[in-house]
């Protein structure tokens, strides 16, 4: 997506930090209301969950590396989501909550932005966050937050250039 002839990152097009904070807040509110997805939060969650989630998404979508610098790496995030067995219904409902949160946060007006954000969240939910069903101890050390651009997952050295 271009703004004044300059290519924007998905992070910028989503409204930067403020846009992703709105999205994280809207998604969190929706999942807490969903009878299936809310189970993932039934044992409590970090008091700054929304801010941390927005920082994670920001880093993945071409924004600042605040999450990795202040909170942890991909290994930590994947371990938090691992060891719970398969949960396809929960994943699909979390994605549906995300799609509704895009509307709530005002990020669904631009179809290209809506689609890329949906694709990112659906990919992350059904791959990186649900890869280790048996045990969080199976998650390898040293994982980096995957980067996502307008064209999908960014592989290799170009991940630092989005």
Q: Where do the model's predicted regions map?
A:
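Heme-based O2/NO sensor domains and their adjacent alpha-helical segments
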Residues: 2-8, 21-110, 114-120, 127-133, ...
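Short, Lys/Arg-rich amphipathic segments at extreme N-termini
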Residues: 8-15
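Short, contiguous alpha-helical
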Residues: 123-146
């Amino acid at each position: 997506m271009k703004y004044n002839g300059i290519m924007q990152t998905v992070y910028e097009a989503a409204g930067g930090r403020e846009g992703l904070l709105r999205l994280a807040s809207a998604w969190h509110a929706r999942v807490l209301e969903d009878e299936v997805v809310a189970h993932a939060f039934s044992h409590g969650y970090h008091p700054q969950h929304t801010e941390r989630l927005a920082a994670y998404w920001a880093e993945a979508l071409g924004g600042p590396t605040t999450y990795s610098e202040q909170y942890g790496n991909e290994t930590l995030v994947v371990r938090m989501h691992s060891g719970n067995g398969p949960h396809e219904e929960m994943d699909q409902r979390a994605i549906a909550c995300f799609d509704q949160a895009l509307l709530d946060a005002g990020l669904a007006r631009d179809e290209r932005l809506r689609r890329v954000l949906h694709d990112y969240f659906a990919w992350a939910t059904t791959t990186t966050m649900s890869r280790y069903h048996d045990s969080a101890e199976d998650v390898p050390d040293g994982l980096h937050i995957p980067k996502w651009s307008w064209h999908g997952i960014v592989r290799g050295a170009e991940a630092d250039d989005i």
